[in-house]
Amino acid sequence: NELGHLEEAKTYVDKIRSRAGLENLPANLNMASMRDAILDERGWELYHEGYRREDLVRHGKLLEKVNEKYHYYFGKDMPWKNNNDRILQPIPTNALLLNPLLKQNPGY
């Protein structure tokens, strides 16, 4: 998808969806929509394997998805009031000691 091969990406995602008994993705997805669809599929396929949060952080979608979840559960907007400095994990102390050019992530 990121290299512009939308149809090829859609083919692979549709194979996964078909195996699960789901409908194919819509035919008219653009690159951003396909990226979101792929992130969602990864979230369902790899549930509880520890990838979802990191995928969302890497693509800048963590707060968006967390806020969607709160809206779904509570039926109204309840923005995530957690400390946004905790989106990134701390860099291990050993890594900081080995490389003085590293800067610790905000909030740690």
Positions of predicted regions on the chain:
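Acidic/polar-rich alpha-helix caps and helix-coil junctions
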Residues: N1-Y108
